[in-house]
Amino acid sequence: MKDKTVRFITFTAMGIALVILAQLLGNVLPAGFTVVGPFTGKQLLTGSLVNCVLFVFTGAVGLWSGVIIGLLSSLLAYLFGIGPILPVVPVVACGNALLCLVFGLLRGKLSDWLNVVIAAVLKCGFLWLLVPLVVRAVGVPD
């Protein structure tokens, strides 16, 4: 039991470190080009790296490891000055947790590739719906 707990904590901490590293990497890149809609190249790279870490750690360490990494990474990114505005942090954290929950709960039922697609589409839809609502609610100018 003790070894499992130590492994869980150690790997989860490594996942948090990797997600923060991915966010820092995205922060040092130039503003970038628009890819599609509101997405920039920087956002696409950073988001893809973060999601990759969340998928890997959810699959390798467990569902709750991924959820913890997803929740804490958003808060830590904000505290380091690299995350979104404060009112959006809980929305992004919940989007990350949703990604991990969907992927983790579907594991073994469908192919991992299909699970990745389903989880990513749900997270994207969740963020596309809620982030603009939160931004408007707090009165952030366009």
Model-predicted segments: where are they?
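Loop-helix junctions at membrane interfaces
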Residues: 1-142
